[in-house]
C-alpha cells in the first residue's frame, strides 16, 4: 500500500489548544493516521501519514471544520510517498512553541521576512548572485547531525545542537552575512522562517527564507546545488532529491544517522549499536 506523508505548519494565534487536542486526536485515530501534531499558542506543526483517502480527509477536516474557526483554511501541505508507514503511533502534543527558539517577541504571524521560491533560488545559485547582483549565501538553520546528511553547496553551518542556539551564533558571526543576500533554509520552512525574522530584527539586511524549505526545493527543482540527502524526523531517516527514502537508517541506541557505508562496520548491530556508539564508548 502506498502511504502519503504530509508535513505542514502555520503560525497563527490559538487560544483553544487544550480543547482541540482530544478532538483532533480522535479524528486522526478515526482516519487511521499516524504521526505527530504540535499545537501551541503560536500555531500548528504537523507530520502525519496514512492512505490517500485518509490524508485527503484530514486536509479537508483541518481546513474546513468549524472547530478551527478558519485558522487553517490556507494551510499548505508538503507531500511525499513511501511504501510503508513511517510512524508508530498518533500523537497530538501541546507545546509552548511549535519550534523552540526561546524568543517570545518573535511572532511570525505579525509579519514574515521575505521568502524566495525554489525556482528563483536555483536561478540565483546558477548565476552566483541575486537579481540585484549581490552574492548569495545559504544559511543552514538545522542541527549539526541533520546537516551532515546533506546540505546546499557552500552553505554556512554553525554546528548548532538545537535551534534555540541560533540567535547566539548569529550574533557571534554576523560579519559572515554583511553585504550578501542571506537565504536561511531548513527541512520544511518552519525554522528558517523564525531565523529570518530574527536576523531582520537585529539589523541584518537582504534576508530571505527558502519558501517550503529543502523538501519543497526538491519537489520543485530536484537536487541542483545540493549535495547528499535531507534528514527527516521519522523512520525513513532521510529523503533524496527525488523525495524517495534512502538507505540511511537511525541508530536505535544513540539516534545517530548510519550511512550504508557505516552499516558495513562490525560496530553496526541493528537495534543495538553503530560506529558512532563505538567511538563514543572508546572516548569515554
From Swiss-Prot:
The active site is at 186 (cysteine persulfide intermediate). InterPro entries: Rhodanese-like_dom, Rhodanese-like_dom_sf, TrhO, TRHO_N. This is tRNA uridine(34) hydroxylase. Residues 132-226 form the Rhodanese domain. PROSITE patterns: RHODANESE_3. Belongs to the TrhO family. GO terms for molecular function: oxidoreductase activity, acting on paired donors, with incorporation or reduction of molecular oxygen. Its EC number is 1.14.-.-. CDD domains: RHOD_YceA (cd01518). The gene is trhO. It comes from Burkholderia ambifaria (strain MC40-6). Catalyzes oxygen-dependent 5-hydroxyuridine (ho5U) modification at position 34 in tRNAs. PANTHER family: RHODANESE-LIKE DOMAIN-CONTAINING PROTEIN 7-RELATED (PTHR43268:SF3), THIOSULFATE SULFURTRANSFERASE/RHODANESE-LIKE DOMAIN-CONTAINING PROTEIN 2 (PTHR43268). The keyword Nucleus does not apply. Transmembrane segments: none annotated. Keywords: Oxidoreductase, tRNA processing. HAMAP family: TrhO (MF_00469). It comes from the Bacteria. GO terms for biological process: tRNA modification.
